[in-house]
Amino acid sequence: MKIKNSLKALKARHRDCQLVRRKGRVYIINKTAPRFKARQG
């Protein structure tokens, strides 16, 4: 999982990337290609 300051560019890396908010943190999840997972902050 990548940890980045901004997830805007990471959301565009794959067409199945979804932005989700869990427990005050922002995540990118991708069910078809899990290597694109990321967390902000």
Curated annotation (Swiss-Prot):
Keywords: Ribonucleoprotein, Ribosomal protein. InterPro entries: Ribosomal_bL36 (IPR000473), Ribosomal_bL36_sp (IPR035977), Ribosomal_L36_bact (IPR047621). It comes from the Bacteria. PROSITE patterns: RIBOSOMAL_L36 (PS00828). One of its GO terms (molecular function) is structural constituent of ribosome. SUPFAM superfamilies: Ribosomal protein L36. One of its GO terms (biological process) is translation. One of its GO terms (cellular component) is ribonucleoprotein complex. The keyword Ribosomal protein applies. The keyword Ribosomal protein applies. Belongs to the bacterial ribosomal protein bL36 family. This is Large ribosomal subunit protein bL36.
